[in-house]
């Protein structure tokens, strides 16, 4: 939970998945912690404290997008990652920048609904259990001559116990459940996303309240009934208010590939549309009000984190007004041989662990010797230097090439132990790493 984590705790959490790039991690951790700090400030001043947006600059494959992905999991807040290249200025074919906030609102509604349903889950489980028992043991009809049996009779209690122990999971029952409409997708013209959304929700509301009988296993029925009962206990209006407040106060937007909409001074053509997207982004980043189907959303306190490789353009190629909206600049460094080694050994879900787990399913024991790891790191670094620097992604290609034959014949090697040392790596990748023409096409 990000609001209770200190910046150093956030950084150490990111360290489990991303090697190096401490400047970027620190900037992101401080920005995340500042959301919590702002909430502790008294009201007149709190409104004036706006988030300091971040611009991450660095070559591809060094961890910019990965920082965003991991941040999304850490941040107990509405978070959306989008590519700036998807958008065009109003009037062109493409997405309108206001859809960023609408998508963020959808994310917040989903997140809030999940957390609200968790709170009422115990009550929902009890109600679902009673409904299931009513189907398994229909209550006897009262004809008027005798008292109806107690609801929790002995038989009912026996069935309740069996249900809780999972003994009835595979029993087939027929149940009346809410009918779901077949999902339909409505394609609207560019810039008319809001109207399209309204038409979609209008059609979605038409089938509400209808029920139909379905045959299913008790286990599946129990899950369905829990969801139905939880939905009854959640107040939709209250949920909307909470979600909108959460977007306005804690929302985070990660704008990837922002360098692709920067004007490249030496190139002509296409600049109008690029500048248009930047100008459309301006009010959103600075603070405006966007209309969504859940209500109006102010963007004043939404945190924007932008990132780009800036190979062909520079941050100064962005329009000055937009540059000013991203006061915190962080440069990410290219990866060294030591970084590649750390990526292969120190991260929580490193490639070496992934391949070991995959081959273990075929009963092949894969072991990586330190000199083998070092050689792999050297080859990945060397190919990046000679051909095209694609950062950590180069390791995917190198590892796949290294273990190609072993993966193919794994079933025949069942029960064997394979050690990947420097000699093994050189035997399979040595020629490719040395021959620049070959590595250009193969690695």
Curated annotation (Swiss-Prot):
Residues reported to bind ATP: 19, 61-66, 256, 321, 393
InterPro entries linked to this entry: AAA+_ATPase (IPR003593), ATP-dep_Clp_protease_ClpX (IPR050052), ATPase_AAA_core (IPR003959), Clp_ATPase_C (IPR019489), HslU (IPR004491), P-loop_NTPase (IPR027417)
Keywords in alphabetical order: ATP-binding, Chaperone, Cytoplasm, Nucleotide-binding, Stress response
UniProt GO MF annotations: ATP binding; ATP hydrolysis activity; peptidase activity; proteasome-activating activity
Entry's localization field: Cytoplasm
Name recorded for this polypeptide: ATP-dependent protease ATPase subunit HslU
Domain of life: Bacteria
GO biological process assignments: protein unfolding; proteolysis involved in protein catabolic process
Main localization (coarse): cytoplasm
A Pfam family this chain is assigned to: AAA_2
Quaternary structure and partners: A double ring-shaped homohexamer of HslV is capped on each side by a ring-shaped HslU homohexamer. The assembly of the HslU/HslV complex is dependent on binding of ATP.
Protein function: ATPase subunit of a proteasome-like degradation complex; this subunit has chaperone activity. The binding of ATP and its subsequent hydrolysis by HslU are essential for unfolding of protein substrates subsequently hydrolyzed by HslV. HslU recognizes the N-terminal part of its protein substrates and unfolds these before they are guided to HslV for hydrolysis.
Entry's family note: Belongs to the ClpX chaperone family. HslU subfamily.
CC per GO annotation: HslUV protease complex
């Amino acid at each position: 939970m990000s609001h209770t984590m200190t910046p150093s705790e956030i950084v150490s959490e990111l360290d489990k998945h991303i090697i190096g790039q401490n400047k970027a991690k620190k900037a992101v951790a401080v920005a995340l912690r500042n959301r919590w700090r702002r909430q502790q400030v008294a009201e007149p001043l709190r409104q004036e404290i706006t988030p300091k947006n971040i611009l991450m600059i660095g070559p591809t494959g060094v961890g910019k997008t990965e920082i965003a992905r991991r941040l999304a999991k850490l941040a107990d807040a509405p978070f959306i990652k989008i590519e700036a290249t998807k958008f065009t200025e109003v009037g062109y074919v493409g997405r309108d920048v206001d859809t960023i906030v609408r998508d963020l609102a959808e994310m917040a509604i989903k997140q809030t609904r999940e957390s609200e349903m968790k709170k009422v889950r115990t009550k929902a489980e009890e109600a679902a259990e009673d409904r299931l028992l009513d189907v398994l043991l229909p209550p006897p009809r009262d004809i008027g001559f005798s008292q109806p049996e107690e609801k929790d009779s002995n038989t009912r209690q026996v069935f309740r116990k069996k249900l809780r122990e999972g003994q009835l999971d595979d029993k087939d029952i027929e149940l009346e459940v809410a009918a779901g409409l077949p999902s339909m997708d409505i394609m609207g013209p560019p810039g008319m996303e809001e109207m399209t959304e309204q038409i979609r929700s209008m059609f979605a509301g038409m089938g509400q309240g209808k029920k139909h009988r379905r045959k299913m296993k008790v286990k599946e029925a129990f899950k369905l009934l829990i969801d139905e009962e939880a939905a009854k206990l959640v107040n939709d209006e209250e949920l909307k208010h909470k979600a909108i407040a959460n977007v306005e106060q804690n929302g985070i937007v990660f704008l990837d590939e922002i360098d692709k909409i920067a004007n490249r001074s030496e190139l002509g053509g296409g600049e109008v549309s690029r500048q248009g997207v930047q100008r459309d982004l301006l009010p959103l980043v600075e603070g405006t009000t966007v209309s969504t189907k859940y209500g109006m959303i102010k963007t004043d306190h939404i945190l924007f984190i932008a990132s780009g490789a800036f190979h062909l353009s520079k941050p100064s190629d962005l329009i000055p007004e937009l540059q000013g909206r991203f006061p915190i600049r962080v440069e990410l460094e290219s990866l060294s041989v030591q970084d590649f080694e750390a990526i292969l050994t120190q991260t929580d879900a490193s490639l070496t662990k992934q391949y070991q787990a995959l081959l273990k399913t075929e009963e092949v024991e894969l072991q990586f010797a330190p000199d083998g790891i070092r050689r792999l790191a050297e080859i990945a670094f060397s190919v990046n230097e000679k051909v095209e620097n694609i950062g950590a992604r180069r390791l995917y290609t190198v590892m796949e090439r290294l273990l190609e034959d072993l993966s193919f014949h794994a079933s025949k090697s069942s029960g064997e132990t394979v050690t990947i040392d420097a000699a093994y790596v050189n035997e399979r990748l040595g020629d490719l790493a040395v021959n620049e023409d070959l590595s250009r096409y193969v690695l």
